[in-house]
UniProtKB/Swiss-Prot annotation:
Gene Ontology MF terms: SNAP receptor activity
Ranges where the t-SNARE coiled-coil homology domain occurs: 226-288
InterPro entries reported for this sequence: SNARE, Syntaxin, Syntaxin/epimorphin_CS, Syntaxin_N, T_SNARE_dom
Presence of keyword Membrane: yes
Glycosyltransferase among keywords: no
Membrane-related topology note: Single-pass type IV membrane protein
Record note on disruption phenotype: Gametophytic lethal in homozygote plants. The double mutant syp41 syp42 have short roots. Plants lacking the three genes SYP41 SYP42 and SYP43 are seedling lethals.
Chief place where the protein resides: Golgi
Signal peptide boundaries: none
Name by which UniProt lists this protein: Tlg2p-like protein a
Organism: Arabidopsis thaliana
C-alpha cells in the first residue's frame, strides 16, 4: 500500500498559521485607550485536514462587543500534536540505537580497564531507548482513545503507521540485545576455559627457581578472570531484563499491526465484491437492452409504421385513378 509523507507540508502550514497576528489599526488603538479593550483574535471553524470540521471559537473580546476586524485562525486537531511527538520520540530512539551499537562494539573489545564506564553507558542508553518506546506506546493508546469521528480514518492510518515503526524499532533493539548477550556469554565461556587451564598448570611441579613467581602470576590472572566473569554475569542479567521489557512492548504493539493486516484483507474482500457487483450489473444491462429491442412497444411501433405506409400508398392510388 503506497503512502505519502506530508509531514513537512503540514508543519509549514502550521508554522505559517502560528505566525499570524491581529493587526493593530488606529481605530483599535483608540478603542483600547478609551474602552480598555485590546485586539481581538478569534478561532473559528477552519481546519487544514478537514474543511467540514468545526472547532470551538476562542475570542478575547467581552460578550456583546463587536468582533469586526478580527482574524480567524484554525488549529489542527489535538491528536496531530500527539502523533508528531511520537515521531520525534521514534527519531530520538533511532539515534540512541546507533549509539548503543557503537557502545556494544566498544564494550566487547579487549581492554586493560575494568569496563565499568562502557557498561554504565550501555545501561544508560538501553534505559533511555526503553523509556522512549514505552512513552510512545502510551501515546499511541491515547491517540486511539481520543478524537472526533470524522477524523477517525486519518487518525487510525497514522496510528497504524507509527505502530509499525515502533514494532520495527523494538525488533531491532531486541536483535541487538540478543547478539550482545550471545557474545557476552561466549566471552564468559572463554574466560572459564582460561581459568581451568591456569588451575591445571598451578599444580604442576616446578623445575626452576621461578616457580613461585609463576604461581603468583597465575593466581592474579585467575582472580582477574573471576572478576571479569562476575561483571559479565551482571551485564547478562541487565540485558535479559531489557529484552523482557521489549517483549512486553512487542506484545502490545502486535495488536495494532494485526488490525492493519485485517483492514488490508477487508479492502481486498470489498474489491472482489465490487467486481462481482459490476459483472451482475453488466448482465442486467444486457438483458434490459435485449428486452427493449424485442418488447411489445417496439412491435406496436413497427406495425403502426407499416400501416401508415400502406395508407399513404392507398391515398396516392386514389388520387391517381379518381
Amino acid at each position: 500500500m503506497a503512502t505519502r509523507n506530508r509531514t513537512l507540508l503540514f508543519r509549514k502550514y502550521r508554522n505559517s498559521l502560528r505566525s499570524v497576528r491581529a493587526p493593530l489599526s488606529s481605530s483599535s488603538l483608540t478603542g483600547t485607550r478609551s474602552g480598555g479593550v485590546g485586539p481581538v483574535i478569534e478561532m473559528a471553524s477552519t481546519s487544514l485536514l478537514n474543511p467540514n470540521r468545526s472547532y470551538a471559537p476562542i475570542s478575547t473580546e467581552d460578550p456583546g462587543t463587536s468582533s469586526k476586524g478580527a482574524i480567524t485562525v484554525g488549529l489542527p486537531p489535538a491528536w496531530v500534536d500527539v502523533s508528531e511527538e511520537i515521531s520525534v520520540n521514534i527519531q530520538r530512539a533511532r539515534t540512541k540505537m546507533a549509539e548503543l551499537g557503537k557502545a556494544h562494539a566498544k564494550a566487547l573489545m579487549p581492554s586493560f580497564g575494568d569496563g565499568k564506564e562502557d557498561q554504565h553507558n550501555i545501561e544508560s542508553l538501553t534505559q533511555e531507548i526503553t523509556f522512549l518506546l514505552k512513552k510512545s506506546e502510551k501515546q499511541l493508546q491515547r491517540l486511539s482513545a481520543s478524537g472526533p469521528s470524522e477524523d477517525s480514518n486519518v487518525r487510525k492510518n497514522v496510528q497504524r503507521s507509527l505502530a509499525t515503526d515502533l514494532q520495527l524499532l523494538s525488533m531491532e533493539l531486541r536483535k541487538k540485545q540478543s547478539t550482545y548477550l550471545k557474545r557476552l556469554r561466549q566471552q564468559k565461556e572463554d574466560g572459564m576455559d582460561l581459568e581451568m587451564n591456569l588451575s591445571r598448570n598451578r599444580y604442576r611441579p616446578e623445575e626452576d627457581d621461578f616457580g613461585d613467581m609463576l604461581n603468583e602470576h597465575q593466581m592474579s590472572k585467575i582472580k582477574k578472570s573471576e572478576e571479569v566473569s562476575v561483571e559479565r554475569e551482571k551485564e547478562i542479567q541487565q540485558v535479559v531484563e531489557s529484552v523482557n521489557d521489549l517483549a512486553q512492548i512487542m506484545k502490545d504493539l502486535s495488536a495494532l499491526v494485526i488490525d492493519q493486516g485485517t483492514i488490508v484483507d477487508r479492502i481486498d474482500y470489498n474489491i472482489e465484491n465490487v467486481a462481482t457487483t459490476v459483472e451482475d450489473g453488466l448482465k442486467q444491462l444486457q438483458k434490459a437492452e435485449r428486452t427493449q429491442r424485442h418488447g411489445g412497444m417496439v412491435k406496436c411501433a413497427s406495425v403502426l409504421v407499416i400501416l401508415c405506409f400502406i395508407m399513404l400508398l392507398l391515398l396516392i392510388l386514389k388520387e391517381i385513378f379518381l
